[in-house]
């Protein structure tokens, strides 16, 4: 299936909490289809030194949330970016709204370098 517009949120979500659920809900307001990209255990170990829940456990919880339409793995890269997840969403949609929350802003979003001139990718922070 191909979509006009999808929202994408990415993160470790380890453990998932009410702030994440609010983040997902706000992201869903930008489109009719919400994709949640979950970082791997390896990514979490590099960022935090360890992980609490496996990718499979986090995905199982998140995929059962009413507002979530799809769950994907965020491919690891050298920058710790979500560029691979954006690429996956571009395969199924005309437009991707990449929604950033938590510790990300315009000054520390590596995905901007690659996609800021791509008319099919929009960025939201909040």
Pin down the residues of each PLM region:
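Nucleotidyltransferase catalytic core that binds NTPs
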Residues: 1-126
